[in-house]
């Protein structure tokens, strides 16, 4: 193998691949990136037993095709230090030489045949994603998921495919809150009418870096493969049964309040400077915010005027986690939001105002949250 490649193109590709390397054991083949030159393309692969990525860049010139491997971390360390001009990569015996002008490096290779093959699946479900709504849903629900949850099933995001109605439900929870959305008019091809899979949060975070729109998603129930023109990504799925979240959602709410999103965000941020929990009081023409701190005498208070007034006879009090409330508001694509409540001790719902239009490219997220006991 002997090629010339753009320094910037190679460095960008290597940065994407770092998350897929085994950096603890340099003797493992999983610490290496697999390189293969085919015609005018350099294909790069990195994988451990759970997750993997294959990408390619165009070569500037290709004198000889071939394969090789190289320690992924050291490869990036070298390339990032070089100047912004073409780089020569050449395999010699059991080493890979890296050259640019008067600088040269040589790193040992492993046997490329020992590199694990990328999986080929027989999909039970597949979709073509031509707009950013799915990635938008992933991005907004990701903060709710605990990667280290003691319940394995909850350490990922649920994707629930309904072929009959052509809908995809996306759900995440940490048991204290639950965020969900239903994406409609999805072209689902499935061997079963209803099928679901749980993507690990680690995979979810990498998907957000690699994909936006114009990609395919396929799953055989054990693995998921996501692919676009530049990248092929695979991940093992979480094996388990996700809780039936529909049973958790209240059938109805006693009260429903339409409120200003930005005013609430500013007020919560002010009070959360002293405490992570806040007492929210809703009155006919005001929303009052007060920090809750049982250990110190520190307090923070602020209020927001509600111009249109609320249909409420007496003050309604609610204890909320400031961080959770802010993340729920940040997931909304409208300037107003709806707060749906029952008793102060019961879960409450935050969702977008149905009267306000938003971009059809955005996912409409609803978040059910447990209150803080006052």
Curated annotation (Swiss-Prot):
SMART domains: POL3Bc
GO cellular component, one term: DNA polymerase III complex
Gene Ontology MF terms: 3'-5' exonuclease activity; DNA binding; DNA-directed DNA polymerase activity; identical protein binding
Cell compartments where the protein resides: Cytoplasm
GO BP terms in the entry: DNA strand elongation involved in DNA replication
Keyword Cell membrane in record: no
Cytoplasm among keywords: yes
A Pfam family per the record: DNA_pol3_beta_2
Record's keyword terms, sorted: Cytoplasm, DNA replication, DNA-binding, DNA-directed DNA polymerase, Nucleotidyltransferase, Transferase
Subunit structure: Forms a ring-shaped head-to-tail homodimer around DNA which binds and tethers DNA polymerases and other proteins to the DNA. The DNA replisome complex has a single clamp-loading complex (3 tau and 1 each of delta, delta', psi and chi subunits) which binds 3 Pol III cores (1 core on the leading strand and 2 on the lagging strand) each with a beta sliding clamp dimer. Additional proteins in the replisome are other copies of gamma, psi and chi, Ssb, DNA helicase and RNA primase.
PANTHER family in the record: BETA SLIDING CLAMP, DNA POLYMERASE III SUBUNIT BETA
Summary of the function given for this chain in its UniProt record: Confers DNA tethering and processivity to DNA polymerases and other proteins. Acts as a clamp, forming a ring around DNA (a reaction catalyzed by the clamp-loading complex) which diffuses in an ATP-independent manner freely and bidirectionally along dsDNA. Initially characterized for its ability to contact the catalytic subunit of DNA polymerase III (Pol III), a complex, multichain enzyme responsible for most of the replicative synthesis in bacteria; Pol III exhibits 3'-5' exonuclease proofreading activity.
Family: Belongs to the beta sliding clamp family.
Protein name: Beta sliding clamp
Gene designation per UniProt: dnaN
